[in-house]
Amino acid sequence: MPIADMLINEASGHRVITFLDGNAGYNQIFMAEEDISKTAFRCAWFIGLFEWVVMTFGLKNAGATDQRAMNLIFHDLLGVILEVYIDDIVIKSAGLGNHLADLRLNLERMRRYGLKMNPFKCAFGVSAGKFLGFIIHEKGIEIEPKRVEAMKRVEAPTCKKDLQKFLGKVNYLRRFIFNLSGKISSFTPIFRLKDEAEFTWGQNNKSHLRRLRIICLRRQYLRCLREGSLLGFMWLQKIKLLVLF
């Protein structure tokens, strides 16, 4: 499976975007003849046994199989004019003229392989849209509004499971939070408690939770120092060079 963060980065920063969503994408892949019997299921009222001739939802490798099929179909277009995550397709272009050509190339490829999209979930030639839980557009990436609203409704956890749910929501926004691991380190001792140990939520934990919520609700910006100028940087950890731009 592709790395979602990388796809989001590659899909953002373009002026014109088209979003396509597969119409029951799994069902567009035929089952191997020798594996059809493994999908047998029975119905009520003694109707009998039925078998799937197309890939159904819930199979262990269904997602990976769908992604592999899409990679084979769009192998020469991936990372160039489009990005694909299972049955979600983003066609990206610098301008409208280029986008029409890119869109035609993509649709011709889909027609050749018989791919069908859900027209109610598609958006053509727009400037912004939702992809993998984030809003992407020419200027970058934004947090989806409903995730911000979810953070507003967060209450103090009463057990380890509640805390895990909250940190799961925070981790989804990690690209917008500097030094996230350091900001959540105060919660580490709680996760080390044994199941039979009493869950204690102290004043220090409350203040850290409140501070973390404020950070998540604050709009984040990444802006170049001067428009039109080049910017280079190095990212190092101790004396080991990690990234050079």
Segment roles from a protein language model:
Residues 1-245:
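Retroelement reverse transcriptase polymerase core
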